[in-house]
Swiss-Prot record:
Localization of this protein: Cytoplasm
EC number: 6.1.1.7
Organism: Methanococcus vannielii (strain ATCC 35089 / DSM 1224 / JCM 13029 / OCM 148 / SB)
Entry GO terms, CC: cytoplasm
Protein name in the entry: Alanine--tRNA ligase
Keyword set, alphabetical order: Aminoacyl-tRNA synthetase, ATP-binding, Cytoplasm, Ligase, Metal-binding, Nucleotide-binding, Protein biosynthesis, RNA-binding, tRNA-binding, Zinc
TM region(s), chain numbering: none
């Protein structure tokens, strides 16, 4: 469809705004200023608010949040609480919250769920890392910013307001703040994102964009647009930019973090920089797109020319202050990331948090700050507690995770030199891909890699080239920021799309029902579809029910689009339209119910012991055991496991009621928060809420016991680290736990019998045997060393001459390590050693002044690989044949 839009609104007509075309960028805009010829936005106009505040009073960040919210609240917009900066809590297509509208996607914007309020106002903290390398340097860029927004959702049945009122509210807010209306321009523009599109206004004053007013009304399909039934007012006001413009500080950082910046400058002994220099830098940066320039040298050069200073001197002067600015921004970003429960890891949102953290630590090292990062983040938490008290409530976790991550960072840096040195032996240039791989795989920041290379180059004849681009972290962040949350395949098999009504799920009404009658609606391959069922279809981590339908075994149950597919052993027994009787294997169902409710109980216990940051990333509920994967920054200790078990079993003994109810999605989120999505994102406007009274609440479609006392004893069988930042617990319940404990007891009794001691003496006896074994191992190693020395002299006599070289081919007794030790002693100048043992192991080692490659040699006489001077592998021929092949190669 052809898109046309009239950008004229009621306000423009009533106040005699004029529509003009910018003399520089040629965009159309609306203004009250009859003399204006440019659109007002940078680079067509430069910042004119620096040193010249544009509002009647100066606003701090906290004050601006309140002012914005109160303004729209007084004008009929219901305030809505912010959502976490982890968008994965309610959607699976993005990791971080990048805009206020992201809070309402996809459910509200797609018309599947009604908005919690309409119209509404929200001040939503957002994180975007695509400009992370510009932060601190341009004066305006932030990784973490707050998008103030008023949203209205217009449908056929409920119309709120559209373009006229949206523009009117924006203009009224700016005038209330004291901004001169003649300085405000409304640039006509177009917005697209997340598959939606619509016309918009960019609202500009004094060279800076303060708001964007989007009218979302189209869906983009290929190169075309289709109208959507829900017309959405999607506005975005830059809260930080409003505060900055109201204060007129040289950069946005002084407006947000002035107290923290002063403390950091004093701590690091940063020399005083003339505010005019920073103001000039920010003003010129506003006229440039740093990424298009390529790096920051062009900006530096322009500032230096403007103020009449040598560019190198300027760089030396302001770089430390720019690091301070970046540290201030990054620590606020980390406060939200960790405060909202992100666990650092090497994947997804955990990777992004670690990237920001390690970049911050590196900057702190560069500028010489003696504060710990914990102290700086505490400053941030204190400064924000008035508007975000929930963040300081996570202080204990934040401090613990910072301790853990700082230790890991130090270990990474300490290992770094060896990793880089090994790489330089193989190549003469460290490329961008090398730097990214070193960062992704080893956690090595590029600056540290460069420092190591610079040191190596001082003493090495061969110089290694390296270039670290100014936008390195931006490149890395963009690669990871768009990672999608993993899609979990619900179906084991590819099931067909059927035009049938959804199957009535009887277990939602009564989980204890085991028999039912139903009508066969459809037969597909080995599956039958009924109008109703008590069989639970596999999903949500829980295994399917088993049983019989009309005496035929049900061996698999799956669901697609609300239709349940029952796989039976003999499909010939069924006909479409027939009535059938189904019977559940209730003992099997009961085991699944116990284990599923136990999953919720253990999850609650984990939060009590480890902290509120714990978040379920996966689960598997089977009849014999359950499995739960959760986020945590360290391995779970034995002490913590005991405490988790203790709390879980206390919950069982308390006999807490377990209730299941259906709730409106908005009501559930308002009452319980996003913690209900522990089991994953749940579609639809109605949620089934499973609540263990006073213990746990989750949106869950599984089958559960009615009281925790029905679970029986819970036993955690083992834990493992399945990936960085994710712990897996395996557990059993009821009789399953009894059997597991009995099996462990048998192991203890058998071990005690072998050692001839009572069970209570096992630890002490095992320790004594271990110490004795270590001593005996030392004695054996000494004897082996002496035998090796004797063997060395015996083998020296067996070397054979081939040209200028000497070669030894011999089969000896010993392990691979023992053969390696012998070869180390024998492979001296001009000698080649080939040793093999009885386990088909073979090694080739050479001394100095031997040109032939051992890697090439081993591939001729056996199978294996290695390096120029040493190769190992397997052999399958006789010693004599190996000798012949080796001699043949050496004679060539």
């Amino acid at each position: 469809m052809e898109i046309t839009h009239d950008y004229k609104v009621k306000l423009f007509e009533e106040m005699n705004f004029e529509r003009k075309q910018c003399s520089e960028c040629k965009q159309w805009f609306w203004t009250l200023d009859k003399e204006r010829i440019t659109c007002g936005d940078s680079p067509c106009d430069k910042y004119s608010f620096i040193g010249n505040p544009i509002t009647t009073k100066k606003y701090t960040y906290n004050e601006m949040v309140k002012e914005f919210t109160n303004f729209f609240d007084e004008r009929g917009h219901s305030p809505v609480k912010r959502s976490p900066v982890i968008a994965k809590r309610w959607r699976d297509d993005i990791l971080l919250t990048i805009a206020s509208i992201a809070v309402f996607q996809p459910w509200v914007t797609n018309g599947l769920v009604k908005p919690v309020k309409n119209p509404l106002v929200i001040t939503q903290p957002c994180i975007r890392l695509n400009d992370i390398d510009n932060v601190g340097r341009t004066g305006r860029h932030l990784t973490c910013f707050t998008m103030g927004a008023h949203h209205a959702f217009n449908s056929k049945d409920e119309y709120k307001y559209w373009t006229d009122k949206t523009v009117e509210l924006c203009f009224e807010l700016m005038q209330k703040l004291g901004i001169d209306g003649h300085t405000i321009t409304f640039i006509e523009s177009w917005w697209e994102g997340g598959g939606n599109a619509g016309p918009c206004y960019e609202v500009i004053t004094h060279g800076v964009e303060l708001a964007t007013l989007v009218f979302m009304q189209y869906k983009k399909v290929g190169n075309n647009y289709e109208e959507i039934p829900l017309k959405i007012v999607d506005t975005g006001y830059g809260i930080e930019r409003f505060a900055w413009a109201s204060q007129g500080t040289p950069t946005v950082y002084e407006a947000l973090f002035s107290d923290i910046i002063e403390k950091l400058k004093k701590n690091a002994n940063i020399p005083i920089v003339d505010e005019k220099i920073m103001a000039e830098s920010a003003t010129l940066a506003g006229l440039m797109d740093i990424e298009n320039v390529g790096d920051l040298k062009a900006l530096r050069q322009k500032v230096a020319e403007k103020i009449g200073m040598d560019v190198n001197e300027l760089d030396r002067l302001i770089s430390p202050l720019e690091y301070i600015y970046a540290i201030s921004d990054h620590t606020r970003c980390l406060s939200f990331m960790f405060g909202d429960g992100i666990v650092p890891s090497n994947v997804k949102e955990g990777y992004l948090a670690r990237l920001v953290l390690r970049k911050t630590l590196r900057y702190m090292e560069k500028v010489g700050i003696s504060y710990s990062i914990k102290e700086i983040i505490l400053m941030q938490l204190e400064s924000m507690k008035e508007v975000y008290p929930e963040l300081i409530g996570m202080k204990d976790y934040i401090m613990d995770v910072l301790d853990s991550e700082e230790k890991k960072y130090i270990q990474t840096v300490n290992k770094g030199r060896g990793i880089v040195e090994r790489m330089t032996k193989l190549k003469s240039e460290i490329t961008l891909n090398d730097l990214i791989n070193l960062y992704d795989s080893n956690g090595l920041p590029p600056e540290i890699v460069k420092d190591i290379i610079d040191e190596i180059n001082k003493t090495s004849k061969t110089k290694i080239s390296i270039h670290v681009p100014d936008n390195f972290y931006t490149i890395v962040a963009e690669r990871h920021e768009e990672e999608k949350a993993e899609e979990v395949a619900i179906l084991k098999h590819e099931l067909p799309e059927l035009d049938l009504p959804k199957t009535e799920l009887l277990f939602f009404k009564n989980t204890m029902q085991s028999e039912f009658e139903a009508k066969v609606l459809k037969i597909v391959d080995k599956y039958i579809i009924l109008d109703r069922t008590v069989f639970y279809a596999e999903g949500g981590g829980q295994k399917y029910d088993i049983g019989q339908i009309s005496g035929v075994d049900v061996v698999d149950v799956q669901k697609k689009n609300g239709i349940v597919f029952h796989k039976v052993l003999d499909i010939s027994k069924f006909k479409e339209g027939n009535l059938v009787k189904g019977e559940l294997n209730f003992e099997n169902r009961l085991k699944l119910m116990r284990n599923h409710t136990a999953t919720h109980v253990i999850n609650a216990a984990l939060k009590q012991v480890l902290g509120k940051h714990v978040w379920q990333t996966g689960s598997n509920v089977d009849t014999e055991k359950g499995r739960l994967d959760v986020t945590h920054y360290e391995r779970i200790s034995r002490k913590e496991i005991k405490e988790i078990e203790k709390i879980a079993n206390e919950i069982v003994l308390l006999g807490k009621p377990v209730t299941c109810k259906f709730m409106d999605r908005n009501d559930a989120e308002q009452e319980y928060g996003f913690k209900i999505y522990q089991g994953g994102v749940v579609p639809g406007d109605t949620l089934r809420i499973v609540e263990i009274d006073g213990i746990d609440v989750e949106a869950c479609g599984g089958t559960h016991v009615t009281n925790t006392s029905e679970i029986g004893y819970i036993k955690v069988l083992k834990t493992e680290r399945i990936q960085d930042g994710v712990e897996r617990l395996e557990y059993s319940t009821g009789m399953g736990s009894i059997f597991e404990i009995a099996a462990l007891e048998d192991i203890l009794l058998d071990s005690a019998e072998v050692l001839g001691v009572p069970i209570e003496n096992l630890p002490k006896t095992a320790k004594r045997f271990f110490e004795e074994w270590k001593e005996q191992k030392k004695v054996i190693e000494e004897l082996q060393k002496k035998v090796g020395e004797l063997l060395k002299y015996e083998l020296l006599e067996k070397f054979e001459k081939v040209g200028n070289l000497e070669i030894l081919v011999e089969k000896v007794s010993g392990t691979s390590n023992e053969l390696m030790a012998i070869a180390d002693n024998l492979a001296t100048n001009g000698k080649i050693v080939i040793l093999m043992n009885d386990t088909d192991y073979i090694l080739c080692k050479k001394g100095e002044n031997v040109e032939i490659s051992m890697k090439e040699l081993i591939q001729k006489i056996g199978k294996g690989g290695g390096k120029e001077n040493l190769a190992q592998g397997k052999y399958s021929t006789s010693k004599e044949q190996i000798r012949e092949k080796a001699f043949e190669l050496l004679k060539q």
